[in-house]
Amino acid sequence: MSLAETATPQENGLTGRTVFMLATGAGFAVAAIYYSQPMLGILVNELHAGVSTVGLVPTLTQIGYALGILLLAPLGDRHDRRQIIILKGVLLTLALLLSAFSGGIIMLLVASLAVGITATMAQDIVPAAATLSPAASRGKTVGTVMTGLLLGILLSRVLSGFVAEFFGWRSMFGAAAIMVLAITLIIWRSLPAIPASTTMSYPALLASMRHLWRDYKPLRRATLAQALLSVGFSAFWSTLAVMLHEVYQLGSATAGLFGLAGAAGALAAPLAGSLADRRGPELVTRIGTTLATLSFALMFLLPLLPVPYQLALIVVSAVGFDFGVQSTLVSHQSIIFSLEPAARSRLNALMFTGVFIGMAVGSALGSVILEFAGWQGVVVMLTLAGLGSMVVRWMSKKLHP
């Protein structure tokens, strides 16, 4: 039994206040990846760069996040996660300040990569919560922290859209730095130490991930299905602001409002966890991938509708696919966390590396397709990504991983 498993979570037990703190920390950290998306139209004008070049801002952020998860998150099994969370919080604050004071697109791109790498403190918080929580309430605790993380993803767009339009894009990055620093200080004062679960060296940790990937087919299936959904998820949100500006002449604040619709998807986290406990996570992944795909395909109807109904349909689609994507994500975490408790950080790192590679691909392809094939071309891409995830989840004859 690992050190993490023998640590006494009941003694270190998480109060409701501590769980809320961790959920807030995860939300603030992961939000840093998405602040740029609603302001892409503003960045095109103010930095005098092309749409495809500015599209590299969220792309590099997500690539940085994927690299940080793959190369840094496994350290959570080797070192005190509290120390890692605090260090990343300080570095993320500095990266956000660099974004705020960027003098041009090149500096902003470099800062975006740094933001992505350090924002992986969110992926240290989730397994930290799972380790500190007693087994009887672990699912509820992780679900609550994931709700904070998912709200951070979606509400970040709402906040960013308004702040960028009325106070400027630099103000948004500056405010984000203050929020991250504040929650980091609170975590420093409140979170207990978290014992390591292994004494393996860093090279051995990385090498063990290859064996985990090879040994666990459920991990591979979960990663592939979630990565495909992430392609569609990211392509939609990274191109929405530009499309709304070009087609409907709507500002970044309006684009941010669509994040409120998508925030409804965060409510799927506890609901999906509860259903997975009763009926098994495999069933929930099938429902989630199907709902996301149908919601993507619904936007093929846009050319047939008048403008007000087109906007309403986009809102309905956003609610539907976000609910499907987040339900599938929580169920996939339920699957992989049960595989090998002592390797939770590494298992989580492997799956989320795939997720954010998918997001980076979605951002990059979405921007290019929007520029050359329009919004309907983007919808084709979203639907194909959803269909791919459905194939992965429905190809199994079992309802359990």
PLM ranges: what are they?
Residues S112-L149:
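Cytoplasmic helix-loop-helix junction between adjacent transmembrane helices
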Residues I69-D80, A268-P281, L370:
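Helix-to-loop junctions at the C-terminal end of transmembrane segments
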Residues M107, S137, G143-L191:
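Helix-loop-helix hairpin linking two adjacent transmembrane segments in secondary transporters
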Residues L67-I105:
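Conserved MFS/SLC helix-loop-helix module at the cytosolic interface between two early adjacent transmembrane helices
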Residues E5-G13, L191-L224:
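Juxtamembrane intracellular "pre-TM" segments in multi-pass secondary transporters
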